[in-house]
Swiss-Prot record:
Belongs to the HrcA family. SUPFAM superfamilies: GAF domain-like, Winged helix' DNA-binding domain. Negative regulator of class I heat shock genes (grpE-dnaK-dnaJ and groELS operons). Prevents heat-shock induction of these operons. HAMAP family: HrcA. It comes from Thermoanaerobacter sp. (strain X514). PANTHER family: HEAT-INDUCIBLE TRANSCRIPTION REPRESSOR HRCA. Keywords: Repressor, Stress response, Transcription, Transcription regulation. This is Heat-inducible transcription repressor HrcA. Transmembrane segments: none annotated. One of its GO terms (biological process) is negative regulation of DNA-templated transcription. One of its GO terms (molecular function) is DNA binding. NCBIfam families: hrcA.
Amino acid sequence: MPLDDRKKKILYAVITDYIMTAEPIGSRTIAKKYNIGLSSATIRNEMADLEEMGYLEQPHTSAGRIPSDKGYRFYVDSILRNYINNEPPISYNTREEIIAEFDEIVKKYAKILANITHHTTVAKMPKLNPDRIKRIQLIPVASNKMIFLVVTDTGIVKNYLLNLCQNVDRTIFEFLNNLLNEKIAGKNEKDVFEFLQQDLRHMLGEMVFIADELINTILLSLKQLQETDIYADGTSHILDFPEYKDLSKAKNFFNLLDNKSLLNEILEPEVDFIDVRIGSENKFEEMKDLSVIKTTYKINGRVVGTIGIIGPTRMDYRKLINEINVMTKELSNLLSNIYNDEI
């Protein structure tokens, strides 16, 4: 049975008030605070109907009502249907990020989102397999130290510090740069492994002393580029919500954030736009009292990761949907600009 305009107005009033106060609301309060144009008695009857239809709940013996997950879902769907981003773009100085690693850029944006929303944010860094190494660069920082820089064909940057057992002059660095880019750049994983295991030591000749460091670092970079990394920020914000003054609930929330494999599944993108999962809609028991708003970020149109906001079902969905949308658009634009030449 579809909701008529009267029921919609009352449902939205209950949700709006509960988001702000965390307290059940009664018909008299709605009549006084919200310009619905209905008497308290009429509102009371409509609220009883909404409860019977599953959109509202009556906690314990309270005279007031609170939204159910079904009520939140109706509210969120109406937001997403009518969603227009009227907020100005977030101004952000990208100069520092351009020299940062990919995952550090994403972490910084997740931190900003947590600070803006006062909610816990989680970010999923990409699993890049089967991406290939596009470029390797060895940068000397001392005669016995160098930075090993890896750039993938999606522009992801990883760097490692190598400590060498002997001093190496710059001509050797140039030789190694040319050799590794010739033999590894653009090759698939199988060819890279074969080169490392069968050919590298022979090609290094008198420089074989550097072989173990190079082989171990290249293998480590390949392994890490195939792993999904999960980052969380603003974890303490959950304690600002009255629902989580209960220490056992707070403990369960922090245990959830420690479960990286579970967060990985929670952040798995299911739609190409903003995805909202409310309370009981989540398939994991640990998320039954929580909602997650998640969306993907991209490099030149290609999805490379996910960012989400996790909090109580009593969250300001309209505000948070707008903020995560603006932030991920900014992040996608920045990443696309930085890595445009690398793809």
